[in-house]
């Protein structure tokens, strides 16, 4: 069997790939591995608003209880809330049932350890090994040793209280639009901003189990971009389905993506002397404009592979405080162990309020270079061809010379599909289009 866990837990189409049976087995194996030898271990379980959440929660919880662990169910809360509450309630582990920004037919199961961090590859492999061994040596307790399920009613309030504590100001006098993606932020985000005194208008906060991420939220911010201008708001904030990411919209209706957010927050933290070693951790996919803006502000960047888990690894290694991705996964390590959309949203608003500048003015420290993406369809065993083929490497060299320091070429094999992604950045969008698609076609031709 191939590896069950991807970069973000176990994901698949609910009831087809991610079945109730698999959820039960993951609950059972996960509870056993993560609470080894602990007396009556406690595991926190939360989920987003997908229709398949109830089915998977019931199965997962059965698995947890079957090995004698206690399941603490916190209902619909953001993924970062599960990471935080696992620590707060001193649970042995946390599990979230969500497929984040993916369409509704997908769902996922992701584990956190007792400290609120995503599991290491080794622990995930151990869970898989137990499932593949058909639970050899895993006890099935009886009588009073069977686990119990507890519903934690105050989870939402506890998370809101934590989120509010991350900024040192109220938001009175600010008019803010929220797009909750019909997802897990639909209560917590709205309540938090209202309790801080902001005038809040909300779209896409009426989840019906099927409309999560559907033409809304951080993956489709177009509606919010119009709405902010129409309603004359100071800014808008868009979350994804499980609210671990957040994008902003300025008062003019422009999208402020994760790169702009890191530029704004990085400069703010540096000016306050709170940016450890004056470093921001970013991925190779961040826009070159971010590197130039941070460099101008005397902030160093450390680059990682794509994926918030790699950003987090680098931050933990060196004690860096701020890192993230263009997609709006921003990690403030002083506050949470994972990307937290609500904390990111509050940080942006507090900086706007404290600086007395508009969001568009704050964002003007960065100029985004045009970026073009092209995909080359390539068999999985030929994904390294761009490193080995002379004609391809000559073409890459030629493009790099043409961009001469005012752009770049990035080639990245997809981790999940038979594709190689070609990304070009520079100043002339039309020319980039021609070059990127030409290079993708060449890679495709040579690989097939």
From Swiss-Prot:
InterPro entries: A-D-PHexomutase_a/b/a-I, A-D-PHexomutase_a/b/a-I/II/III, A-D-PHexomutase_a/b/a-II, A-D-PHexomutase_a/b/a-III, A-D-PHexomutase_C, A-D-PHexomutase_C_sf, A-D-PHexomutase_CS, Alpha-D-phosphohexomutase_SF. Activated by phosphorylation. Its EC number is 5.4.2.10. The active site is at residue 100. GO terms for molecular function: magnesium ion binding; phosphoglucosamine mutase activity; phosphomannomutase activity. Coiled coil: none annotated. One of its GO terms (cellular component) is cytosol. Belongs to the phosphohexose mutase family. PANTHER family: PHOSPHOGLUCOMUTASE (ALPHA-D-GLUCOSE-1,6-BISPHOSPHATE-DEPENDENT), PHOSPHOHEXOSE MUTASE. This is Phosphoglucosamine mutase. It comes from Clostridium acetobutylicum (strain ATCC 824 / DSM 792 / JCM 1419 / IAM 19013 / LMG 5710 / NBRC 13948 / NRRL B-527 / VKM B-1787 / 2291 / W). The gene is glmM.
